[in-house]
């Protein structure tokens, strides 16, 4: 009778390998988790289901259409980049974000690297300029160090940097005019993002970078536009917003505002590539009633026939401007319309301004998120 030596050896080795019991595996896992927390601090490792801070909460942008496109608003504890051509509404968008944070009891800071902040305009948008922290740094290193220290304090809820293009490295400022400084700003941004991103997530502070557009030289095919400061910000940003001016609003020959279109070029916390449109009125900022009227018309709450708008069978205004004026004068009807619009969106209505994408999921997500004030969260 022949015996297979190899099979006998393999069966013997298999019998020697004793798998740990489920209880022993759990003990080993708890032991290593405890050791990691002792070495690196509490919260350094956790189960995703147990981590309440992993839940991404949001705060409003100031434009209802943009809130829906973002899945609820700006995410807390993330990096946001807003870019676009000149006079497209970038600073206005961030000033509204600051006003929303302050309205909820939060602390806001504005790093004015361009030295162009208009306090009168900011106040007209609802910003509490008495309590707004403002810094006008001399160099890019100084600006980003200030941002890092504000974020580390965990006492600030939003920091706006205006803008990345104005963050000039110290070597460039101290050098002669015409000296080459290839890649110095990109290196500065790359180092800064590596340093502050982790602290942003831990503190819950939202950092919004404004950025300008440049043209790539020698690009024949494709989009020649690019943003300043290299690629680091593109990678570290959870949300990137591309804002454009698509129309100038006029009454006769008088220009009183612009129509802005925002494309969500990147979004790590909600579906990307949605589009939102809203009016920006000179001296007054984003028209919240204009956003409400647009969504009310899209969802069928307000009916438009020709130039006339009607609500519950009654004509409320001829033309868009007159209808917005009617909404301003009838706050009770305005609140009713807003409630109906939100209900329609939750039920699954589609909005063409957002690329015909159903926004029910975004509205449901926004409705489920707890309305906790920023002050109580900091406490």
From Swiss-Prot:
GO MF, one example: ATP hydrolysis activity
Region (Disordered): 1-23
CDD domains: RecA
UniProt keyword annotations, A-Z: ATP-binding, Cytoplasm, DNA damage, DNA recombination, DNA repair, DNA-binding, Nucleotide-binding, SOS response
Cellular location(s): Cytoplasm
GO CC, any one term: cytosol
Main location: cytoplasm
Entries under PROSITE patterns matching the protein: RECA_1 (PS00321), RECA_2 (PS50162), RECA_3 (PS50163)
UniProt KW Ligase keyword: no
GO BP terms, alphabetized: DNA recombination; DNA repair; SOS response
Domain of life: Bacteria
Biased amino acid composition, Polar residues: 7-16
Family as reported in the entry's similarity comment: Belongs to the RecA family.
Listed name of the protein: Protein RecA
Source organism of this protein record: Prochlorococcus marinus (strain MIT 9313)
Biological classification of the source: Bacteria, Bacillati, Cyanobacteriota, Cyanophyceae, Synechococcales
């Amino acid at each position: 009778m022949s015996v297979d030596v190899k099979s006998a050896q393999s069966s013997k080795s298999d019998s020697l390998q004793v798998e740990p019991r489920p209880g022993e595996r759990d003990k080993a896992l708890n032991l290593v988790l405890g050791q990691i927390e002792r070495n690196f601090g509490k919260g350094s490792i956790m189960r995703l289901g147990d981590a309440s801070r992993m839940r991404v909460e949001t705060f409003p942008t100031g434009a209802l259409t943009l809130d829906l496109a973002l899945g609820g608003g700006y995410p807390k504890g993330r990096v946001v980049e807003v870019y676009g051509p000149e006079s497209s509404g970038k600073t206005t968008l961030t000033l509204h974000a600051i006003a929303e944070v302050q309205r909820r009891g939060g602390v806001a800071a504005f790093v004015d690297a361009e030295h162009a902040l208009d306090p009168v305009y900011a106040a007209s948008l609802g910003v509490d300029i008495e309590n707004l922290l403002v810094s006008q740094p001399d160099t890019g290193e100084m600006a980003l160090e200030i941002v890092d220290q504000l974020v580390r304090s965990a006492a600030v809820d939003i920091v706006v940097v205006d803008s990345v293009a104005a963050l000039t490295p110290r070597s460039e400022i101290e050098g002669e005019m015409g000296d080459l400084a290839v890649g110095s700003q990109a290196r500065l941004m790359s180092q800064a993002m590596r340093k502050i991103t982790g602290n942003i997530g831990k503190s819950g502070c939202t950092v919004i970078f404004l950025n300008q557009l440049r043209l790539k030289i020698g690009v024949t095919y494709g989009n020649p536009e690019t943003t300043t400061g290299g690629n680091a910000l593109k990678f570290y940003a959870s949300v990137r917003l591309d804002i454009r001016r698509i129309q100038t609003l006029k009454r006769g020959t008088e220009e009183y505002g612009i129509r802005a279109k925002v494309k969500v070029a990147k979004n790590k916390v909600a579906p990307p590539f949605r589009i939102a449109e809203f009016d920006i009125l000179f001296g007054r900022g984003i028209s919240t009633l204009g956003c409400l009227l647009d969504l009310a018309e899209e969802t069928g709450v307000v009916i438009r026939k020709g130039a006339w708008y009607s609500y519950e069978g009654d004509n409320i205004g001829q033309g868009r401007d007159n209808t917005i004026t009617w909404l301003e004068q009838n706050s009770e009807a305005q609140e009713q319309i807003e409630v109906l619009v939100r209900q329609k969106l939750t039920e699954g209505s589609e909005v063409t301004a957002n690329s015909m994408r159903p926004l029910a999921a975004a509205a449901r997500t926004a409705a489920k998120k707890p309305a906790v004030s920023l002050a109580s969260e900091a406490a």
